[in-house]
Amino acid sequence: MRFPAPMIKYIGSKRMLVPHISGIIRTLPDVQQVCDLFAGTTRIGQALKRCGLRVHSNDLATYSEVFGTTYIATNAESVDAERLRRLLAELMALPPVRGYFTETFCEESRYFQPFNGMKMDAIRAGIDMLATNETERAILLTSLIEAADRVDSTTGLQMAYLKGWSARSYNPLELRLPDLLPGSGAVTRMDANDLVRQLDAEIDLVYIDPPYNQHSYFSNYHIWETFVRNDAPPTYGIAKKREDCRTEKSAYNSKKQAGTVFADLLNAIRAPYLLVSFNSEGYFTRDEITAMLDGKGYVASVALDFKRYVGAQIGIFNPSGEKVGSISHLRNHEHLFLVGPDRSRVEAAIGATQERAQTKQIALCGD
């Protein structure tokens, strides 16, 4: 069995949903091409690519486009892995430089140890000098982001950092070649509601995992956005967020607008199958989402119980050691909704998912 490669800490990664989503897809033999509209780190897209599907990865975040280029669009069999290893070795050999990343994220805040920040500054500048095309650039940037994530001092969100240095933050930054996958796919950076009106008619299933409350992934992971853009933006607050985090908001993050924009998205989709995941902390209830999907075909759903992300369990602290906010609950539900033209297939797929959840079985491609 081949498990997904390790990835960055990401509150929206759906790591625990991967086996359930893979299992659902495997019960639908007529599904060959899938679009992931809100791809994030591309964890779901990677799992589906491993299933032999052609995947179209989309997200508005620039860092997601980099992950999509690396893991979804790139065919591992067409890449010169030895050249990439040489480039990574050259980047690791660069002398440290005290630049924007060190000053902003290591000295003015404490996301990373300064000795690692100086390596990041040097490597980020080196990537733009050494990469000869967008694929190489994306792979090298992915390696840098994943390396930085392994030595950070957060609970997985970049809204704050730990009151004391994490143990991993003392480890030296180490670039590794990303675990590329065979096969090609597509990647876009577009508004999801615009993209669905342009999607290839051959897309068989659209996976929808929209932002579900007021928290923006753009601001939750502002450091990765800055790593990719390399634009040294002005920042604000203890978290040193990009200034444009104040204005870069999705309609899905607004309680007043989310219902309208989500309904518009669903109405515009023409694929025969829809697979929607939604968190119980979101704006919509299970019944409300079922009603929205009802006109698209037969609908079945399952609720899966999971622990909340680690920051919600231990709390987040500011530089003075004071806890920011309070812990309200430790568990929530991820709802999976499948919509399709055949009632028996839809119900069988969701029924099998419910059984796997109850027996703690997993279904990953390659087993």
Q: Residues of each region from the PLM?
A:
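SAM-dependent nucleic-acid methyltransferase catalytic core
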Residues: 2-3, 39, 97-98, 102-220, ...
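A short, conserved alpha-helix within the catalytic core of class I
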Residues: 216-223, 257-262
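Conserved phosphoryl-transfer catalytic core
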Residues: 63, 68-122
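Conserved proline-anchored active-site loop of SAM-dependent methyltransferases
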Residues: 21, 34-48, 57-62, 201-220, ...
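Conserved Class I SAM-dependent methyltransferase catalytic core
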Residues: 249-296, 300
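C-terminal catalytic and target-recognition region of SAM-dependent MTase-like enzymes
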Residues: 285-288, 292-362
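S-adenosyl-L-methionine
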Residues: 1-38, 43-51, 65-67, 74, ...
